[in-house]
Amino acid sequence: RDNVIVQIKNGPVDFQPREPYSPLFGAMPRTPQMVEFQITQEYLGFSNHLAYLAPMWEEFFDFVKPSSLKAIAGVANIGTDTNWCGHPFAQANWYAFGRMAWNPSLTSGTIAEEWLKQTFFDVSNPKHAPIAYEIHNMMMESREAVVDYMMPLGLHHLFAWGHHYGPEPWCDVPGARPDWMPSYYHKADKQGIGFDRSHTGSNATAQYPDSLCRLYDDIRTCPDEYLLWFHHAPWQHTMQSGRTLWDELCYRYDHGVQQVRSFQKKWDLTENYIDAERFKDVQSRLKIQARDAVWWKDACLLYFQEFSGMRAPYEVERPIHELEDLKQVKLPINNHECPTPKMLNERR
């Protein structure tokens, strides 16, 4: 019907840090469709974490032609902060959504450059260029860093029960729906980890066009970033890097932590170029993000290590938490509250 548009989330589950695009796009060629993105960071650290989301949306448009859509929606919320968004860099996601909705051919890099020029400093100004270049890179790397320290290699739904802030891959709530539990998705056991959506499992790969179906269905050709979305892979599975799956998982979590620490250093370069209030605000939030990244890394690797029985590679930073202590972390918040630094420091 011409007066009906079916609104579809960008991915098959629910705005995870990385999902393949929903196969509903293209499956109903006679039905008007629109995509639903999430601007607010329900699963990407709320307004405590820097996560520039335009690369995620650009990734979606690599698979789904904008011309096939009738409209775009963005799920967002605002608060009482002066900047409405909490994190100063969360404003960039509102801006990027508007720019991509108007012109989806724009690159996420171009949009980040526009936003930086209007918000902090001009990339083309020789005085600001070196600093702006570093902050532009920080923005462009931020979403991938979140993927790495939260749910790399296609993992998803590992977050805490209820409010979705922080890791809880062990979560098991008696009487709750099985598909609300992390174990329903990660399916970690002594043999391996990941959700088998190939032809030997749920066969979700068959919902994609033939070329992608073949790519995703074969564990030998499935891209690393979607491996554990589509396959229950053995811990010793050889990744594209040549590492085992377990080693690659460790390296990805560790890389995410190191990335956030590099963001702290890059941001410190801006102190003499912007106002003190915004400088300190972002600096404080990056401290939270750095500690949260370690929290995620330790929680997930210590938990999954109970199944793999394998040691972390020598180069990977060792945990600073005990698994049993992490299992006791409970934040007294709901979906619409962002934990404060004081709360996090007392509880995680």
Language model features: what each stretch is:
Residues V13-Q16, E42-S47, T82, A145, ...:
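Flexible loop/turn segments at secondary-structure boundaries
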Residues N3-I5, P32-E36, A71-A73:
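Beta-sheet entry/capping signal
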Residues P17-E19, S47-L50, A54, G86, ...:
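Eukaryotic scaffolding regions of large macromolecular assemblies
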Residues G11, T40-E42, F120:
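Generic structural motif
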Residues D62, S67-R348:
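Catalytic domains of carbohydrate-active enzymes that cleave complex glycans
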Residues R1-M28:
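Gly/Pro-rich turn-and-neighbor structural signature
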Residues T31-E59, A76-N77:
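Active-site clefts of carbohydrate-active enzymes
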Residues R1, A27-P32, S68, A90:
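A generic structural signal for short, non-catalytic loop/turn and secondary-structure boundary residues
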